[in-house]
A protein has these predicted regions:
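Glycine-rich, acidic and aromatic/proline-enriched surface loops and short helix-turn segments
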Residues: 106, 120-133, 175-179, 219
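Short, functionally critical alpha-helical segments immediately adjacent to catalytic or ligand/cofactor-binding
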Residues: 93-109, 169-174
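Catalytic cores of secreted or luminal carbohydrate-active enzymes
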Residues: 206-231
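Low-complexity, Gly/Ser/Thr/Pro-rich intrinsically disordered linker/tail segments
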Residues: 225-254
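Substrate-binding/active-site groove segments that recognize
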Residues: 115-137, 149-156
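Catalytic and binding regions of secreted/periplasmic enzymes and modules that target cell-wall glycans
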Residues: 156-186
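Bacterial N-terminal signal peptides
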Residues: 6-16
Length: 254
């Protein structure tokens, strides 16, 4: 699962295409606002995840160097950010995990990277199949917001149980849990605590992954300090299983 980068290819037309897909959702029994989503996230994030260095990091500048554009992107992201954060909270997972799709794909469900990572969570085929996604032929559950989120959070739940540390869990999501276990064994550790001691021997981009999540946490805690006005008044229709606009076609046995 790779971080979003310039070589990321899109099977669609980016944010405009995602916005059009959201417009196609059928009316639901209720709506939510941006306030609902951002309060849910900021209230559940660990305050320690935002350090002074994270707030001033190059990743923060990269993500929010044009505040007006970032605000518009947040509006488009809202239905998906709502679903991901709600499901993470429902499972009792650290809310930092709900920020992973921003790092992976900028919350774009049709993102495809070289080497196989696909969808909102940039899931590899073997991982997706292991967690119940149908991948093959014209069907690929990684393009479904709801299906891919269920699979990714199931994997993250396993990582959280395995490492009991959200930073190590995020590194394992990026580098693979077997690599993280090997790193801990080399250090003579049986349990991770990335606040005190980072696992060694990992790729630079894996360590950067944690820095990116920390930067986004800082933004969620205090967006105004970065010149961004959250779209709190934006109203949207929550995603539902039968309105997922990017779900694969149902298998009718044909």
């Amino acid at each position: 699962m790779n971080a979003f980068s310039p070589w990321l290819l899109f099977l669609g037309i980016g944010f405009a295409g995602l916005a059009a897909a959201q417009d196609a959702l059928k009316p639901a029994a209720f709506q939510r606002s941006g306030t609902d989503v951002f309060q849910r996230i900021s209230s559940a994030l660990d305050p320690a995840s935002c350090t002074e260095s994270a707030a001033k990091s190059t990743w923060m500048k990269e993500y929010i160097h044009i505040p007006d554009r970032f605000e518009r992107q947040l509006i488009v992201m809202l239905p998906i950010l709502d679903h991901v954060s709600y499901q993470a909270r429902k499972r009792g997972l650290p809310m930092e995990y709900a920020l992973i799709p921003f790092v992976e794909s900028r919350f774009q469900p049709k993102a495809v990277a070289k080497g196989g990572p696909t969808g909102l969570w940039q899931i590899m085929p073997e991982t997706g199949r292991y967690y119940g996604l149908q991948i093959g032929g014209k069907k690929d559950g990684r393009f479904s917001v709801i299906q891919s989120t269920d699979a990714a959070l199931s994997y993250l739940q396993k990582l959280q149980i395995m490492f009991d540390d959200w930073q190590t869990g995020i590194m394992a999501y990026n580098a693979g849990d077997s690599r993280l276990r090997s790193s801990l064994r080399r250090q003579g550790l049986t349990k991770a605590d990335a606040d005190k001691r980072l696992p060694t021997g990992l790729a630079p981009h894996t360590y950067a992954y944690v820095k990116k999540i920390r930067a986004l946490s800082c933004f969620m805690f205090d967006p105004a300090s970065f010149g961004v006005n959250l779209p709190n008044d934006a109203v949207f229709t929550p995603l539902e299983a039968d309105t997922d606009p990017i779900a694969p076609a149902p298998d009718n046995g044909n």
